[in-house]
Amino acid sequence: MPPPASSVDFSNLLNPQNNSTDSTPSTPVDSSKTPSTPSSTQSNSNMASSVSLLPPLMKGARPATEEVRQDLPRPYKCPLCDRAFHRLEHQTRHIRTHTGEKPHACQFPGCTKRFSRSDELTRHSRIHNNPNSRRRNKAQHLAAAAAAAAGQDNAMANTASAMMPPPSKPMTRSAPVSQVGSPDISPPHSFSNYASHMRSNLGPYARKGDEASSGMELYLLATAASQVERDEHFDFHAGPRNHHLFSSRHHGSGRLPLLAAYAITHNMSRSHSPEDDDGYSHRVKRSRPNSPNSTAPSSPTFSHDSLSPTPDHTPLATPAHSPRLRPLGSSDLHLPSIRHLSLHHTPALAPMEPQPEGPNYYSPSQGHHGPSISDIMSKPDGTQRKLPVPQVPKVAVQDMLNPGSGFSSVHSSTANSVAGGDLAERF
C-alpha cells in the first residue's frame, strides 16, 4: 500500500537518500515493474507540486500580491508615451521626465540645484546637513576664501585711496635759481635739515589718509589763516630784508585755495628747531636738495590751482618790474643779464617801486571803455540806442603801424560808435 501524498512529499524533500535507497531494491524484481510505474509517476508529480509551493512559503506570498497588483486598473496614462500609472503623483513625476521640469529647489544658501522629485531633494539636503560631508567643507572653505579676498581687495582700495595725493592740487616745483642770481647764501647745515624734511614729510604719498577729510581741510584753513597773520606781523617788524615777502603775500592772502596751499607748505616744512623762529630760515629749507649752495626758491615755489598771476612766494631777489606780475609784452620787459647781477644784498625798496599802469601793461582793461547796455537803452533818443561796434576791428591800419597812438585810436573809435557812426566813416 503506498504512503499518503503529504508524507511522501515531505519525506522526499527532507530525506532524498532514503527515497533513492527504497527505490533501488525494486529494480531487480521484474514482476514489480508494471505496478511501480504509476507509483513513480505519481511521486514525481507530487514533488513538482511541493517545489512549486515552496517559494510562497519562504517569501511570504509576495508573488501572489504582485499578480494581484498587476491586475489593478491603471487610470493615469502618460499623454506623451504608452505608460500608465495607478496613482496621480506617479504620473506627475513621470511627466516631468519628458518636460524637464524641476520644481524642487534646494533652500540652502548658496546652492542653486533643483530637482524634479522630492525624494531627490531630500537626499541632496543631507549633503548640506551632514557636518562630515566633504562637499560641505569644500563649499565653506571656498566661501571663506572669497570673503577674505573681498575684504583684502576693499582694504587695498582704501589704502590706495588714502595714499593717493589729491589730484586737484598737483605739487610742481620750478627749476632752482643759480648761485649767481641768489644774493643770500645758506648756512652749512641747512641742506641736511632740508633733506631730512624732504624724506619724512614732503613726499605726496607720506600724508595720512585723514587729511583728505572735510574736518582736516577746515583745520588746515584755520591754521593757514592764523599762520598768515602771524607771518605778516613778523615780516612787518623784521626789517628791509623780508619786506618784499610781506608785500607780495599781501595780495594773495585772501584766497582760500592759497590758504590751503600755504597751510600744507608750512605743515610740511615745520619743525621745532630754533631756526624756525626766524621767518627767513623756514623758507631756506624749501630749496631743492640738489642745489645746496642756493637758498633762493624760484618764483613761484609751489603752484596750486590758482588762476591769479600773484604767486604764493616771491624770490628773495625780486626782478626790477612790478610785483603784481601783470602780463607784459616781450618788448616792454628788460631784465638785467646774469653778469650784471651782484652777490650783495639788494636795496630795501628799490625793486619794489610800482610802475605806473600804462595802457600796454594790462590789455583786458581796454575792453571796458564806453557806455554799458543799460545806459544805451535808457537814452530818450531812439537814434542813440545803438550798440557799439565790437572793438576788435576798430583799429585802423595806421594805428597798427604806429603802436604809440593805439590807445587814442581806441578812444576815438569808441566815441564814434557811441555817436552812431559806422565803420566807413572812421576809415
Curated annotation (Swiss-Prot):
Ubiquitinated. Deubiquitinated by creB, probably to control its activity or amount. GO terms for cellular component: cytoplasm; nucleus. It holds the Pfam family zf-C2H2. Residues 1-49, 117-136, 159-185, 269-333, 348-427 are annotated as: Disordered. One of its GO terms (molecular function) is RNA polymerase II cis-regulatory region sequence-specific DNA binding. Keywords: DNA-binding, Metal-binding, Nucleus, Repeat, Repressor, Transcription, Transcription regulation, Ubl conjugation, Zinc, Zinc-finger. The keyword Repressor applies. Its main location: nucleus. A zinc finger (C2H2-type) spans 76-98, 104-128. SMART domains: ZnF_C2H2. Residues 405-417 have a biased composition (Polar residues). Residues 15-49, 289-303 have a biased composition (Low complexity). One of its GO terms (biological process) is carbon catabolite repression of transcription from RNA polymerase II promoter by glucose. It is found in: Nucleus. The keyword Ribonucleoprotein does not apply. PANTHER family: REGULATORY PROTEIN MIG1-RELATED (PTHR47428:SF1). Interacts with creB. Belongs to the creA/MIG C2H2-type zinc-finger protein family. Transcription regulator component of the regulatory network controlling carbon source utilization through ubiquitination and deubiquitination involving creA, creB, creC, creD and acrB. Represses the transcription of the alcR, alcA and aldA genes by binding to a GC-rich region in their promoter. Also plays a role in response to carbon starvation and the control of extracellular proteases activity. This is DNA-binding protein creA.
